[in-house]
């Protein structure tokens, strides 16, 4: 009896946790699919196509856009 009650409480807790931490519970899959469709129609919008900055070129310390290494004193090293 105790084990059954503990299992029910655990399932309810995990269900509540899932809903509480969800990014967008309304139309989540619909938004995901429409975004993917937009990226297929416009490859420039894809996050995978973002270019990185080569070594010793000027960089932006906020966005971390260096290909290898880090941005230090406005240059990728």
Curated annotation (Swiss-Prot):
Entry keyword annotation includes Repressor: no
Signal peptide annotation: 1-22
Pfam families hit by this protein: Conotoxin
Keywords of the record: Cleavage on pair of basic residues, Disulfide bond, Knottin, Neurotoxin, Oxidation, Secreted, Signal, Toxin
Key word Repeat present: no
InterPro entries in alphabetical order: Conotoxin
Main location: secreted
Tissue expression from the record: Expressed by the venom duct.
Subcellular location: Secreted
GO terms under cellular component: extracellular region
Methionine sulfoxide PTM positions: 61
Disulfide cysteine pairs (residue numbers): 52-67, 59-71, 66-76
Propeptide span(s): 23-49
Entry domain remark: The presence of a 'disulfide through disulfide knot' structurally defines this protein as a knottin. The cysteine framework is VI/VII (C-C-CC-C-C).
Family of the protein in this entry: Belongs to the conotoxin O1 superfamily.
Protein name: Conotoxin King-Kong 1
Organism field: Conus textile
